[in-house]
Amino acid sequence: MPSPPLAPIDSPLDLDHLSRMTLGDTELEQEVLAMFAEQAVRLVAAMAALPAEAGALAHKLKGSARGIGAFAVADAAASLETAVRTGHGRPHAFAALKEAVTEARAAIEAILKP
């Protein structure tokens, strides 16, 4: 009998992935989460202000998001990259990216709260 499918992750962050990337160093985890939260806001604002640079900025955000386990952000950034490249669906892809970043930042803020 085949195994049941894995349940989807409800959190916008894969904390197991983050722990593997930081070798379980919780202080480092907090540092990279804080840096990502700040970087994500700056990059999304830059994408809005500099539409010609949106593809490159989305690529940068995608890599950072994958590094910390924010896979929904990474997927949304990849979709925006594709939309920029093809010229189709850019407004929708940008809106989805902003939403994914908002969700990831909320999760990060909850983790970093003292």
Residue ranges and their predicted role:
Residues 1-10:
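Intrinsically disordered or compositionally simple regulatory linkers and C-terminal tails
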Residues 3, 112-114:
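C-terminal end-of-chain micro-motif
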Residues 82-92:
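C-terminal end-helix/capping segment
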